[in-house]
């Protein structure tokens, strides 16, 4: 049996706050995401889903517990090791696209690959293939300001997958879009995930979109529970 792409075991996280002093955001969270699986993470605002995603993607460190990415236990690993695994195995998508405004759509997908040591020819070919898969290959030469919100987010998906990660983490990826565009963009995300076979943990307030994923988990009062 293959290893889960992401395994969280006993994750704890507490933040200091003026009042009441400490906020215990995550309380013994356990979660596994299998290869090729799409898992929806639903939670009310402020419940800690962004914190959970940041810990899952090695952008933050839990106070206790273990994070494993593709079988690699990251407990106690230094910044260099964590950065290496994050760059190689994890892709991120946020509510706002965060594309570099001075570069074209194609260049935004090429740049992460160049930073990862991939040759320019190969990087451009992969970028064009990804953009084509989500239907924006005709916009490859446009800068973000010339793209619609839906197009910007599709390019952001492609950038997140540019280095062929094993795990995609998405924080409200359609939250800034109107309902019709949100559905179209989500369809594009599903096409990318299913077409590449990676695993995805996607935080969303949209329960209709969540229901279209393989599994739904809910974060409430710092604890994770399965909905389906």
Curated annotation (Swiss-Prot):
Topology of this chain in the membrane: Peripheral membrane protein
GO CC terms, sorted: plasma membrane
Protein name: Lipoprotein-releasing system ATP-binding protein LolD
Domain ABC transporter, chain residue ranges per copy: 6-228
EC number of this enzyme: 7.6.2.-
List of residues binding ATP: 43-50
Molecular function via GO: ATP binding; ATP hydrolysis activity; transmembrane transporter activity
Keyword terms of this UniProt record: ATP-binding, Cell inner membrane, Cell membrane, Membrane, Nucleotide-binding, Translocase, Transport
Chief place where the protein resides: membrane
UniProt-annotated location(s): Cell inner membrane
Purpose: Part of the ABC transporter complex LolCDE involved in the translocation of mature outer membrane-directed lipoproteins, from the inner membrane to the periplasmic chaperone, LolA. Responsible for the formation of the LolA-lipoprotein complex in an ATP-dependent manner.
SUPFAM superfamilies xrefs: P-loop containing nucleoside triphosphate hydrolases
Subunit structure of this chain's protein: The complex is composed of two ATP-binding proteins (LolD) and two transmembrane proteins (LolC and LolE).
Gene Ontology biological-process annotations: lipoprotein localization to outer membrane; protein localization to outer membrane
Species for this entry: Ruegeria pomeroyi (strain ATCC 700808 / DSM 15171 / DSS-3)
Signal peptide: none
PROSITE patterns xrefs: ABC_TRANSPORTER_1, ABC_TRANSPORTER_2, LOLD
Family classification: Belongs to the ABC transporter superfamily. Lipoprotein translocase (TC 3.A.1.125) family.
